[in-house]
């Protein structure tokens, strides 16, 4: 059975591009347009990995990560999280995002736009790491 990846991003073009890249490698992809929908899909779909944008309406990526630290979500803690952020941010903002992401137990960090091979490499590493746990 193919590994399932939940992609949460409010930009439909990013969602389509990431879905196409991942599906081309045989992954099953589930999408969500905001953090609220992302958490609902996390419960319903039980993915092997979550790719999560930081800046979204309703509930952003930080709020999702904070919510996942609540004991009610403990059975989902083994699911790796790959954070996406915009490369257009200034360096100090990116550093803040990275440090905050590490505090929130995020597994990896990738700037948009990303090369397909970079995305696939990071996804592969996170899924392998999860298998070892």
Question: What residue spans do the PLM features occupy?
Answer:
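Receiver (REC) domain active-site loop signature in two-component systems and cognate sites
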Residues: 56
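Active-site residues of response regulator receiver
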Residues: 9, 53, 85
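Helix N-cap/capping motif at the beta->alpha junctions
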Residues: 31-40, 61
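Alpha4 helix (beta4-alpha4-beta5 surface) of REC/receiver domains from two-component response regulators
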Residues: 63, 77, 88-110, 117, ...
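Short amphipathic alpha-helix used as the core "switch/output" element in two-component signaling
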Residues: 40, 62-75
